[in-house]
Curated annotation (Swiss-Prot):
K(+)/H(+) antiporter that extrudes potassium in exchange for external protons and maintains the internal concentration of potassium under toxic levels. This is K(+)/H(+) antiporter NhaP2. The chain crosses the membrane at residues 6-26, 34-54, 58-78, 87-107, 109-129, 163-183, 185-205, 219-239, 242-262, 271-291, 299-319, 335-355, 359-379. Its main location: membrane. It catalyses: K(+)(in) + H(+)(out) = K(+)(out) + H(+)(in). GO terms for biological process: cell volume homeostasis. It comes from the Bacteria. Residues 405-486 form the RCK C-terminal domain. It is found in: Cell inner membrane. It is a multi-pass membrane protein.
Length: 576
């Protein structure tokens, strides 16, 4: 490659990236996932688009996509709270294993029938599109206030279900490439255990070693993120090299680092945030360039049938069967999880495997995977907000800091500065500082008004437009959100957690005459906490709801996993 070609490559790459960034606000205006914008830019720049760029290098696309996916999973793992595993680990693992297998089987049978394929070829198509995509799920759920059980299940599932899809895809390719060779059940079982076992061991073990290395190293601030990124990629590559799941390993590395006091953690997260955006843009641009839309014309009708069959039948069946043992999921939770079976880059990456293996019909597998991803992002991604509202899994939004930054007081400091901008509707407007019930371990470090730093006293009253800098830790965010909350915009949001609130140590017998409850002898000694456990199980989450004795009960307060307050919503003529 000469200097002129290199400059042309830089020019085109930078131009496409800049266009993708500038067009990204269209996603919110059009109500479509931002990843679809990046993909569309790549398609328009490609062979059939106005850009006319001819790109058919599957090896390069595979390299770029794997690198990007590794970075995205590392960042996603670092932002996942391990506390969410309390309510979501086993359901997510069930979806990541049994769910993928069931989706693969049903989708595979549909593909074999629709495209007149051998049943093994159909299963290969099902395996390629069988897993949800971490990049798509993390991107679309980011910033949404979902029921913790539902949101955590979707995120953990998307970060851990790729190994199953990879295992099924690689196994089926091996069978199809060697039709005369018998694959024993023991061989496949050992391969499965190897993928997951090595992936988990190297992920957690490598994460611990990298965490120790980061905390023991004395480096320039900007180098910690590079150390974490390179260390994560070493573990990712080593896991793949040894026959494990690199995807699972690097996700667990991020999970370990993100939930331990890590030197330079906030700087690392800031750098990874930018790297994740670059990875998403680069990955979907390259995959968009790889697609020739005219190739999809021949599979248009059966492709739609396959995509909607997977969305409306295969995924829901897989979710309902996989979550059968977990009674804490309501039918609405299951319906929403079924709908958010988003497909993204992973199916397209897996579709490159048959191309590189030289399987007959590999181009069809690739085109089908791309078609399913496009339909999934357009239909499921674009309707996510509506689906969350209909399923009632979205919680009323709580105010988040407009910015937050780490305070590196000592190597593993977990202190941060949270910045809040006060609008007119905040409850605290007009209150003197001394009357603010600040959470333990927090302090207002600075107050800005009209671009001027104030020297406040306890009698200083807060005004609309004030900017508060609060020193605290992440564990105080919930309390700070309540402190700086505002009046709900409408009555429906205002009543979400209930009309009246009671503490969970109150006995039902004391509430019976007030709310007209009919209690038997057994219920006389029950507290509200006992009622919640009997209705929702041992691990309720904020926003969990149940109907009991004509009243609607909502979990309205939690502290360290224990329910502290329950809201009671009285029946109305419009109640469901």
């Amino acid at each position: 490659m000469d200097a002129n070609s290199i400059n042309s490559f830089f020019l085109i790459g930078a131009l496409l990236t800049a266009v993708s960034v500038l067009l990204s606000p269209m996603s919110s205006r059009l109500g479509i996932p931002i990843l679809l914008i990046f993909l569309a830019v790549g398609i328009l720049a490609g062979e059939d688009g106005p850009g006319g760029i001819l790109f058919d290098d599957y090896s390069t696309a595979y390299l770029v996509s794997n690198l990007a996916l590794a970075i995205i999973l590392l960042d996603g793992g670092m932002r996942t709270r391990v506390a969410s595993f309390r309510v979501a680990l086993w359901p997510a693992l069930s979806l990541a294993t049994f769910g993928v297998a069931i989706t693969t089987s049903i989708t595979g049978m549909m593909a074999a029938w629709l495209f007149d394929l051998h049943w093994l070829q159909g299963l290969l198509v099902g395996a390629i599109v069988g897993s949800t995509d971490a990049a798509a799920v993390f991107s679309l759920l980011k910033g949404r206030s979902l029921n913790e059980r539902v949101g955590a299940t979707l995120e953990i599932e998307s970060g851990s279900n790729d190994p199953m899809a990879v295992f099924l895809t690689v196994t089926l390719i091996a069978i199809l490439a060697n039709v005369d060779t018998e694959m024993s059940f023991s061989f496949m079982f050992i391969s499965f255990i190897k993928q997951f076992g090595l992936g988990i061991c190297l992920g957690l073990g490598g994460g611990w070693m990298l965490w120790k290395l980061v905390n023991l190293s004395k480096l320039a601030d900007g180098l910690y993120s590079i150390l974490v990124l390179s260390g994560g990629l070493i573990i990712y590559a080593a896991s793949n090299k040894l026959g494990g799941s690199g995807i699972l390993s690097i996700y667990l590395v991020g999970l370990f680092l993100g939930n331990k006091p890590t030197r330079g953690r906030h700087a690392i997260l800031n750098v990874l945030d930018g790297m994740t955006w670059v990875s998403q843009i680069g990955m979907f641009l390259v995959l968009g360039l790889l697609l020739t839309p005219s190739d999809l014309v021949d599979i248009l009708i059966p492709g739609f049938a396959l995509a909607f069959g997977m969305i409306l039948f295969a995924r829901p069946v897989a979710v309902w069967i996989s979550l059968l043992p977990f009674k804490s999921f309501s039918s609405r939770d299951r319906w929403f999880i079924s709908w958010v079976g988003l497909r993204g880059a992973v199916p397209i990456i897996l579709a490159v495997f048959p191309m590189m293996a030289g399987l007959p019909g590999a181009q069809l597998y690739f085109n089908l995977a791309f078609f399913v991803v496009l339909v999934s992002l357009l239909v499921q991604g674009a309707s996510l907000t509506t689906a969350a509202r209909l399923a009632k899994v979205e919680l009323p939004p709580k105010p988040l800091p407009v910015s937050r930054s780490g305070v590196e007081i000592y190597p593993s400091s977990e202190w941060e500065v949270f910045v809040y901008r006060l609008s007119e509707s905040k409850w605290c407007i007009g209150e003197p500082l001394k009357r603010l019930a600040m959470p333990d371990g927090t302090r207002i470090a600075a107050v800005f008004r009209n671009d001027t730093l104030l020297h406040p006293s306890g009698s200083t009253r807060l005004e609309a437009g004030d900017i508060l800098c609060v020193l605290g830790q992440e564990k105080s965010l919930e309390a700070l959100s309540n402190l700086f909350s505002q009046a709900p915009e409408n009555k429906e949001v205002q009543r979400f957690f209930g009309d009246f609130f009671i503490e969970t140590d109150v006995k039902l017998a004391d509430l019976a005459p007030i709310y007209g409850l009919s209690l038997d002898n057994l219920a006389d000694d029950m507290t509200v906490a006992d009622l919640v456990v009997s209705q929702l199980g041992a691990n309720p989450v904020l926003g969990d709801q149940f109907q009991w004795q004509s009243l609607h009960w909502v979990v309205a307060g939690l502290y360290e996993g224990k329910v502290t307050n329950v809201g009671i919503r009285l029946p109305t003529e419009h109640s469901l």
